[in-house]
Amino acid sequence: MMQQQSIFTDALNEQGKHQPSRRTFMWALLKNWWFVLPLFLICWLPVWILTTLYIDDVERDFKQTTDAVGELQASVLRLNLKRNISTADILAGFVEINQGDVNGFEQNAEILYRSIGGISALQLAKDAKISHIFPLKGHEAAMGHDLLHDDLRRKEAYIAISSGKITVAGPFNLKQGGYALIARRPVFIPDYHSQIMQYPNFWGFANVLIMFDKVLEDGGLDTLTAQGFDYELWRFHPDTGQPQSLAGQAGLRENPLSSFEIQLPNALWYLAVQPRFAALSTSQEVAITTLNLLVRHC
């Protein structure tokens, strides 16, 4: 019995002598790198290429989806702003046709106010001083406001006069309370003797007041949030030239997936959009992990 165990042990020891160790195996691979490397590349390279192409395709689709959603909301915002701002042209036309006679302002302003949603108030500013407001309730504090002698309003008011076109001021805090945009259309009437010597035919302004929360509501920006996207509406401040966040997640503009321009008559706004969800779904991540495992065990 003892002799049989000895023979068995000797056989195992003899077999162990002939079995290569892990270190010996690795050394053999290194010595034969010219054979191992091509084999490794044959296994790894196709999988790496397929994985890269797959990820690129997913990210491209992800970017296209974000672009489509963001552009839709940017278009809605543009159209609503354009509609509301252009109301100042209609109001100015009423003054010009009547040669500065503003009798009937309230009746005409009420029609505009009720037919074009999103407007908070319509104003006339004869000689650049607010003289008529509809609706007056809630806006009484703005009556008599001298735009050309207000440090916060003067610059954009003079831009409107000198250009002869609609300008958009704000958003800023109002004297009567609230945060709003104001579209100003300068009105010029032949033979009118203006108080501003360099603009002798300048009658005043036709103004449209648009509350900023209404701009955001009508622009449907809350839809972006509901669909899983973060956004930032921003501009370069006309006085400082520095970026100013108007709404949304401040700082998102630094590295958004998509960005869109909102052109106003005398300003440019930007809408930055970034999805909150990952580019790759759980199933896609599983697929990529599987490919990686195949590479490792090839």
Locations of the language-model features?
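Juxtamembrane extracytoplasmic/periplasmic/luminal helical "stalk" adjacent to the first N-terminal
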Residues: 39-100
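Intrinsically disordered, low-complexity polar/acidic regions
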Residues: 63, 67, 71, 96-270
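Juxtamembrane amphipathic/hinge helix adjacent to a transmembrane helix
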Residues: 8-21, 258-278
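Membrane-interface helix-start motif
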Residues: 29, 219, 274-295
